[in-house]
Design a protein with these regions (language model features):
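Generic hydrophobic transmembrane alpha-helix motif, especially the helices
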Residues: 1-32
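Glycine/proline-centered hinge or cleavage motifs at structural transition points of membrane proteins
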Residues: 2, 62-63, 76
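Hydrophobic transmembrane alpha-helices
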Residues: 1, 14, 30-40, 90-94, ...
Length: 171
């Protein structure tokens, strides 16, 4: 689903129906959470299905309840895939700007927001604003912002790969 659709959904539901303030971090967080949910859900389902049925059957056969089977066998074995999907979803949300533009996170904010309903901006939009400014001094800020964003993306994706390789068990 294109990310702009999630921005329109956030605009319709969170701003028009729930009457939350424009460019509030809580609205941006809810829109990005909705956007990353499909990635996390698909990774979680794939990770849960990857656990062999013989492990479930063996736990049930030894007298474990369904809750104990899920809690002690299924979740620990599928946790690396779940964490990997979560981190990849978060790294996708880190670089998104289209849904946040739809809810009004475009202004330059001078002060640090004091609450979740104060106006705020995000780094991809701030990079765009710095790049579109004609002043020469913003060129260094743009480059630094891009480097910070890329560093976070590389670290998050590296963490996802590390978690996947470190905790994945071979059947």
């Amino acid at each position: 689903v294109p990310s702009i659709i999630f921005g329109l959904l956030g605009l319709a539901i969170f701003l028009n129906v729930m009457h939350l303030p424009r460019s509030a971090p809580v609205v941006g967080g809810m829109v990005l959470a909705l956007m990353t949910l499909p990635t996390i859900i698909i990774a979680t389902r794939a990770s849960l299905k990857a656990v062999p049925p013989s492990i479930r059957e063996a736990a049930i056969g030894l007298g474990a309840t369904k809750f104990q089977t899920v809690n002690h066998h299924l979740l620990p074995l599928s946790l690396p895939g779940i964490l990997t999907g979560t981190i990849l979803g978060m790294s996708r949300a880190l670089g998104e700007s289209a849904p946040l533009l739809m809810i009004g996170m475009v202004a330059f904010i001078v002060d640090i927001p004091g609450s979740f309903t104060d106006s705020a901006t995000v780094l991809p939009i701030q990079i765009y604003l710095w790049k579109s400014t004609a002043a020469r001094g913003f060129l260094e800020l743009t480059a630094a912002g891009v480097m910070v964003l890329l560093t976070f993306l590389i670290l998050m994706n590296g963490l996802a790969v590390y978690i996947r390789q470190r905790f994945e068990t071979k059947w």
